[in-house]
Amino acid sequence: MAFSTIFILLICGICTNMVSAIFGIGGGVLMVPILRTLFPELPIQVISATSLTIVMCTALINLLFFHKQKIKIDYINMILWSIAMVIGVQIGFELSFYFSTAIISLIFTVSLSALAIKTFLNRSRIQIEVFNMSPIERAKGSISFCGGGLIAGITGIGGGSILAPLVGQLKGVKTQQIAVYTNYMMIIGGIGNLYGYLTRAFLYDASLSGQLGLNFLVVGVVTLGSFEMSFFSMKLRGLMNPVLTRKLLAIILFCIAAYMCILEFVFH
């Protein structure tokens, strides 16, 4: 692997950690387009598996810092929503092998564009203190996260960019809890999807070093960059204004969607 590629991947790790810690999205929205650009010879499924592994490693780093900050969540909700996400992820994973790269890229682009518009137009809601979430609200969350997992499984974006706006719409979830919920669900939901990718047979020449269903060398380099950035990201997270954070998230999602669309349908 060229030094320039390693440098780019380190920068990707830094950016991945920032968007994961500050916005609650896993970084898959960054990694999928970047990996498609750096390694165009790899199948989209291998890129998705590599992206998911990076997302899980970054989420684990963030959770260690969240634990030190003593941010509490409802673990019953987290488990129920994670199970729903896993179901959606597995369905999406199986469907991804029946879709062409163009269709997967189209789903990726449309999903991110819709989320960007919704996030940008969404007004700040009044924070309601709810200690016991109603069964209806929990069911609403489960259905939403199953759908989010479906899109994540098809596209390999990790689910955080989809889950973060959905978690924020649920009553009883505080703003500072959103990133904690999504990071937990990205790890749990990603495990099943990653297992499927690693045990699935691929018909391609794995010529890159560190390649086994996913590229472990890429994962290691990006995770290293993510770890180096983690402390600064948590400090920056505490300084960011919620309104500004939401607007920036919308802009990031839209720019990535536009880039992926141009990469696939203009230059491909």
Curated annotation (Swiss-Prot):
Name this protein carries in UniProt: Probable membrane transporter protein HI_0806
PANTHER family named among the record's database cross-references: MEMBRANE TRANSPORTER PROTEIN HI_0806-RELATED (PTHR43483:SF3)
Compartments in which it is found: Cell membrane
GO CC annotation terms, alphabetical: plasma membrane
Keywords, alphabetical: Cell membrane, Membrane, Transmembrane, Transmembrane helix, Transport
Pfam family, one: TauE
Major site of localization recorded for this protein: membrane
Transmembrane segments: 6-26, 46-66, 79-99, 101-121, 147-167, 178-198, 212-232, 248-268
Record family assignment: Belongs to the 4-toluene sulfonate uptake permease (TSUP) (TC 2.A.102) family.
Domain of life: Bacteria
UniProt membrane topology term: Multi-pass membrane protein
